[in-house]
């Protein structure tokens, strides 16, 4: 009789552990699915769709106009957050090959950066008006003094700087892994932006 009680007790403990583990796993899966949905919708911000892309993790150095630059790997790119001036490029560059090998499209949400990993994303915020855009880094530049990023025409229009030509911005890196999970300084800002979104608008985007 005593043995049966012990067996029953052990079975009860085992079932409780399994139940807790299943609950935790289900919660994690739900959170991952919800995040994947938000990745699809860009957290309510205009720009390049946040999808898993291959990021060039190998660093290299190059020299241009008498100055040397060393690119950032994936881990270092995640920590990138800097303010400075943005410009944009289009016109004669439209249709040309970029540093990543892609053809530059002035109507796509892309950008050139001197060191961020090619294939990574960045959240660019216009400091003057607060407007944001998500861009994918597929080129190198700009190499003009005091410029930290060169936006495509579409990206410049999205943050209201097209007519000005130059604007002060904040650039924060975003990395999207193979499972659709985002990380980096830009990801932190996007999550804060999501929390500030109106409830009705948030629901519509989750659906």
Range-by-range predicted roles:
Residues 1-9:
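Bacterial N-terminal signal peptides that target proteins for export
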Residues 22-207:
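Secreted/periplasmic proteins
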Residues 10-17:
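Bacterial N-terminal signal peptides
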